[in-house]
């Protein structure tokens, strides 16, 4: 069990919160991480099952609440039902709707059932639900920054919802890069980087719904924006530290590679874990630029791997491509064992990152620090997606491309002709939903054994290595 630091409450402190326990019965721990503990709970007023998320970092908790409210109401984004702000000795507690499964459980169940992979009609419905959730977030100006199968939760009746928005940010204005290519712009704060305080958008872009059935059924009673802002006003009035957005450390625009040493990479105990999370992602971003150390390595966009701190929703679109490719292959498409190995795997498939394939890439912070020999014959996405139709490969190609400005949006993909081809997507009620896992089941152990390489060192996998000192530090060339 992880001990929290942000609010000082630590693990199991939720049991000493009468404001929480008077309204919710705590049934047991459902999961634990470095920055949050999640408990199964029951609302005392009506017996509705809930998830009680005790977040140990106050800023992260409030940003997650802001992002959930901005994206609401959406059938494919998890509902925030209640929020209990923390204090000097307590952590924030977010009350969310209870969803017992995630998309990784669907992938594992399908992999275990090989060679009978999920029918295309089933796979299309899962894909559409993922796209609906991401489109809802993006239309609200939210960039998730940690999309992966484990963060796409599923109800027992098959409704998939985007969840775990603890690393999310809300952009100043919705949409993608506009005007000059972002990596050719000056180093100032761009108009689409995150605000320190989230804006609750009153009008959202409408996307066509692909849910086959009318959305009947009782929606969970959500926390309203007015209620949430009232709670935040009360909290700020009590705070002795001023603006709550200044409670964490500054990121200092440092990239992952710039803030770790060779020893950090060699001793990484999470390198093979399916649920590897970049703990550096909790660093504060007061300077206006984002941190590049966000998300889970296997789903991290190339610009993040090269240290970009100036990006938008396009990083989610790369993650989306990796997720959909995993639905096709039933295994990760780029299972890197380290950041450098991750880049190497991507390059082996798509070829080298150059100004032709990614305009402005030479301006990325770490682009001139790490070099790879030219890949004469990239494997190509077609080879990574065997036995897939041209339409299926096309969807992945529209997402897994180096240039962020050329990645297809989730809203665009909802209208891709692939979903109108036979076989048509099954209705949600026709999905084959895996059985709920036991609360003590650790699904990450199975995936922790999946390793793309057997090397103990990040550098051993690339053969010879040439380190050159430069006026800015050093550069590394692998062969």
UniProtKB/Swiss-Prot annotation:
This is Cyclin-dependent kinase F-1. ATP binds at residues 30-38, 53. The gene is CDKF-1. Its EC number is 2.7.11.22, 2.7.11.23. PROSITE patterns: PROTEIN_KINASE_DOM, PROTEIN_KINASE_ST. It is an enzyme of class 2 (transferase). Residues 468-479 have a biased composition (Basic and acidic residues). SMART domains: S_TKc.
């Amino acid at each position: 069990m992880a001990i929290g630091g942000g609010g000082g409450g630590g693990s199991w402190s939720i049991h000493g919160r009468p404001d929480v326990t008077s309204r919710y019965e705590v049934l047991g721990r459902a999961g634990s991480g470095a920055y949050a503990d999640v408990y199964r709970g029951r609302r005392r007023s009506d017996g509705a099952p809930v998830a009680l998320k005790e977040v140990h970092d106050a800023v992260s908790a409030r940003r997650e609440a802001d992002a959930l409210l901005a994206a609401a109401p959406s059938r494919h984004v998890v509902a925030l039902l209640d929020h209990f702000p923390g204090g000097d000795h307590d952590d924030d507690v977010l009350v969310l709707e209870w969803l017992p499964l995630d998309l990784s459980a669907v992938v594992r169940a399908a992999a275990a059932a090989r060679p009978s992979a999920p029918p295309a009609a089933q796979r299309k419905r899962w894909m559409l639900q993922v796209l609906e959730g991401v489109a809802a977030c993006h239309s609200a100006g939210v960039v998730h920054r940690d999309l992966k199968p484990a963060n796409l939760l599923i109800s027992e009746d098959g409704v998939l919802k985007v969840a775990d928005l603890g690393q999310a940010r809300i952009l100043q204005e919705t949409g993608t890069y506009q005007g000059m290519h972002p990596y050719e712009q000056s180093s100032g704060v761009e108009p689409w980087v995150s605000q320190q305080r989230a804006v609750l958008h009153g009008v959202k872009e409408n996307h066509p719904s692909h849910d086959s059935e009318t959305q009947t059924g009782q929606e969970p009673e959500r926390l309203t924006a007015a209620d949430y802002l009232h709670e935040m006003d009360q909290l700020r009035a009590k705070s002795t530290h001023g603006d709550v957005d200044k409670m964490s450390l500054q990121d200092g625009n440092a990239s992952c590679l710039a803030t770790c040493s060779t020893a950090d990479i060699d001793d990484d105990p999470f390198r093979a874990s399916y649920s590897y999370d970049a703990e550096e992602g909790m660093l504060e971003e007061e300077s206006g630029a984002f941190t590049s150390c966000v998300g889970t390595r296997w789903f991290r966009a190339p610009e993040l791997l090269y240290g970009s701190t100036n990006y938008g929703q396009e990083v989610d679109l790369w993650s989306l491509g990796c997720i959909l490719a995993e639905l096709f292959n039933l295994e990760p498409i780029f299972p890197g064992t380290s950041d450098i190995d991750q880049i190497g795997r991507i390059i082996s498939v798509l070829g080298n990152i150059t100004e032709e394939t990614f305009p402005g890439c030479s301006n990325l912070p770490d682009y001139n620090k790490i070099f790879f020999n030219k890949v004469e014959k990239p494997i190509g996405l077609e080879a990574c997606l065997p036995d897939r139709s041209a339409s299926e490969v096309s969807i992945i190609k529209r997402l897994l491309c180096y240039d962020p400005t050329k990645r297809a949006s989730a809203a665009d993909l909802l209208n891709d002709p692939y979903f109108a081809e036979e076989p048509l997507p099954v209705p949600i009620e026709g999905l084959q939903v895996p059985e709920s896992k036991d609360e003590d089941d650790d699904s990450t152990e199975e995936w922790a054994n999946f390793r793309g390489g057997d090397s103990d060192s990040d550098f051993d996998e690339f053969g010879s290595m040439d380190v050159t000192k430069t006026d800015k530090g050093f550069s590394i060339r692998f062969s």
